[in-house]
Amino acid sequence: MGVVAKNFPIPDLHRVRRVLLSVSDKTGIVAFAQALQTYNVELISTGGTAKVLMAAGLPVRDVAEVTGFPEIMDGRVKTLHPLIHGALLGVREDPSHAVAMEQYGIHGIDLLVVNLYPFEETVQSGADGQTILENIDIGGPAMIRAAAKNHVYTGVITAVSDYDAVLSELKQHDGCLSFSMRQQLAMRAYAHTAAYDTAIAAWFAKNLKIETPSWQSFSGHLKNVMRYGENPHQKAAFYRNGDKRFGVATAKLLQGKALSYNNMNDTDAAFELVAEFDPQNTAAVALIKHANPCGVAEGQTLKEAYLKALLCDNVSAFGGIIALNQPLDAECAEEVIKIFTEVIIAPDATMEAREIISGKKNLRLLLTGGVPDPRCGGFIAKTLAGGILVQSRDNVVVDDLKLQVVTKRAPSQEEMRDLQFAFRVVKHVKSNAIVYAKNSATVGIGAGQMSRVDSAKIAARKAEESAKRAGLTESLTKGSVVASDAFFPFADGLLAVAEAGATAVIQPGGSMRDEEVIAAADAQGLAMVFTGVRHFRH
């Protein structure tokens, strides 16, 4: 059994008379402390924070003066003292606590202002292990947890963004904090220390190369609340974590309204796909709808790539997402504004392109500052009833694979280029996935079918429809190549793509019936390549 609680009245309003400030981020701390002086509070502070406040002419007592004990061990020990923690934890209405506080000269602290050593920033800076360890805060989290536990009497601020809200509350209640505010601050405080400890544990796990730690936590801070989730009856919000990869989470919204839940999901999928193509070597464009590509292409210019991608399925592209691997230029911008698009995401945009796009007020333009490395590690998490599934990112790139020609006929140089292109794309299509490609562009995409044969037939049918809309006399799949995200379990899927006019196939291989499928390919005169890597996507 845990500790038995004592029940005492909870004050709605509690006056702030004594404040302890100890912050790593000094942003706004002087102005905040000056505002507190309006209420005749006593200011206590530590080390660097005390120096900043004193330099501003504020009356401050150093923690060492309060405790009668100096900072020691390079500042590792300064607030870990009964006169500080007793002041944070003392229950004012408890007679035994009151006696102890009187006996030992402990004066309650009514507001704690702490932000922690910048651990995550230190890790991301590439600092060495010893520097990272020195930036693990000890006294700060201990004080935060103590104050949050005793929020009946003590408010606790852990973020600069809370300064204004607390000052507004003090002004409204003539120097007092309401119980509701103290509860909210306590909740944020525990979330803050939990996230801090999560980051530390994650660093240790990574440093020790432990891929599946015995306890896994995930954390993030609220960036924005969406109007709704996937559907209007669902609630949704976006939380930022420590991942600094270029993408939708770190992008700057240059124009347009805030992104919806579906916008965020689709835009992330689009930019992850287009990142498969090195911007130093080629211009690439991906058109996305419901997190699935409806057109992807490479070109000498973004305009060329966009028009090739649009040809694949210009009907589905309407109202979708456009992702570019190079800065948006005016030539491409003139084309993309011809149809309705929800979001454009790109590393940057020229001033001319921005001017062109600005005429479309409902079009969101996101600039990322760069393109993510498709080989970058990380994890993907999915919640289930009663648990969380975690896996590493699918960061295998076709350039790094040892491709095996398994048919009598080897692909031509042109076919091999298109096969590799198609395999980059199929990795980002929902399974079962089939992609037809020709001239470094998708011409038919079959996604999300329970049968691989159905995916092949759907992709071929859509390619035929696109050809008719474009006024072409034959299907786009004639002379194309095909990528499959997983092996063909039977020869029927391969025969379906051959019937559609494909001349070469790239697939993982590994089926019990590989020999049967290879024989069918040889009989059809197809070239086929095995990658040895599957790209299921659910």
Curated annotation (Swiss-Prot):
Its EC number is 2.1.2.3, 3.5.4.10. SMART domains: AICARFT_IMPCHas (SM00798), MGS (SM00851). It catalyses: (6R)-10-formyltetrahydrofolate + 5-amino-1-(5-phospho-beta-D-ribosyl)imidazole-4-carboxamide = 5-formamido-1-(5-phospho-D-ribosyl)imidazole-4-carboxamide + (6S)-5,6,7,8-tetrahydrofolate; IMP + H2O = 5-formamido-1-(5-phospho-D-ribosyl)imidazole-4-carboxamide. One of its GO terms (biological process) is 'de novo' IMP biosynthetic process. Keywords: Hydrolase, Multifunctional enzyme, Purine biosynthesis, Transferase. It comes from the Bacteria. InterPro entries: AICAR_Tfase_dup_dom_sf, Cytidine_deaminase-like, MGS-like_dom, MGS-like_dom_sf, PurH-like. Pathway: Purine metabolism; IMP biosynthesis via de novo pathway; 5-formamido-1-(5-phospho-D-ribosyl)imidazole-4-carboxamide from 5-amino-1-(5-phospho-D-ribosyl)imidazole-4-carboxamide (10-formyl THF route): step 1/1; Purine metabolism; IMP biosynthesis via de novo pathway; IMP from 5-formamido-1-(5-phospho-D-ribosyl)imidazole-4-carboxamide: step 1/1. One of its GO terms (cellular component) is cytosol. The keyword Hydrolase applies. Residues 8-158 form the MGS-like domain. One of its GO terms (molecular function) is phosphoribosylaminoimidazolecarboxamide formyltransferase activity. Belongs to the PurH family. The IMP cyclohydrolase activity resides in the N-terminal region. This is Bifunctional purine biosynthesis protein PurH. It comes from Bartonella henselae (strain ATCC 49882 / DSM 28221 / CCUG 30454 / Houston 1) (Rochalimaea henselae). The gene is purH.
